């Protein structure tokens, strides 16, 4: 069984969760418990060290890895500045690069993301860049020092599933780096499909936070991710155009 190691840390639970869109900060602790997640993303603007009631960190256990994102950055320079602030505020060395200048579809800018990744990796950050799935950009992110890459399945927050499935599969097959499917996953079955493809992990936020029962939805995604990974490691049987009997069709009545 392959281990998922990022930044020298073994990640045993391959479901990453986000912290946005929940009805209250208090529910996040229960979602983390239900999902078993070791990694949670958060926007820096939700960290308020001067107001504990509004500070999201008060609801995140100390053993959970913080993955602050650079939400709001429209270019590499802004992403770099946000990452440095996050580390200075005590959020650690992990950073999810988000560089989005497209306000309609919220698609990440791969070129600016590569620039930010290079600078931050050189500064000792564990960089996980959010990207449009592309084999060439993936290779350049690896060269820039990314610890993993996070291609989108569909536009962020859309719950539309794996619309970029074939492009993600190419990245899984060709890149020697953890591929974490991020954005667009709307159902546990879609997370399972991503894991069956060989994704190293899935990051889910909107699908859990916008459900009527986020805690049970977190549990559902946990089971789906575990099942999909187990199926991938078990090496699924080949598909066939024709029927193939599982029991002998001859000999019994001869």
UniProtKB/Swiss-Prot annotation:
The keyword Lyase belongs to this UniProt entry's keyword annotation: no
Pathway involvement of the protein, from the record: Cofactor biosynthesis; thiamine diphosphate biosynthesis
Transferase listed as a keyword: yes
Catalytic residues (UniProt): 96
GO biological process: thiamine diphosphate biosynthetic process
EC number, UniProt record: 2.8.1.10
Pfam families the UniProt entry points to: ThiG (PF05690)
Keywords: Cytoplasm, Schiff base, Thiamine biosynthesis, Transferase
Organism superkingdom: Bacteria
Subcellular location: Cytoplasm
Single GO term (MF): thiazole synthase activity
InterPro entries found in the cross-reference section: Aldolase_TIM (IPR013785), Thiazole_synthase_ThiG (IPR033983), ThiG (IPR008867)
Major subcellular location class: cytoplasm
Assembly notes: Homotetramer. Forms heterodimers with either ThiH or ThiS.
Similarity annotation: Belongs to the ThiG family.
Record's function text: Catalyzes the rearrangement of 1-deoxy-D-xylulose 5-phosphate (DXP) to produce the thiazole phosphate moiety of thiamine. Sulfur is provided by the thiocarboxylate moiety of the carrier protein ThiS. In vitro, sulfur can be provided by H(2)S.
Family annotation (PANTHER family): THIAZOLE SYNTHASE (PTHR34266:SF2)
Name listed for the protein in its UniProt record: Thiazole synthase
Species, as recorded: Clostridium perfringens (strain 13 / Type A)
Taxonomic path: Bacteria, Bacillati, Bacillota, Clostridia, Eubacteriales
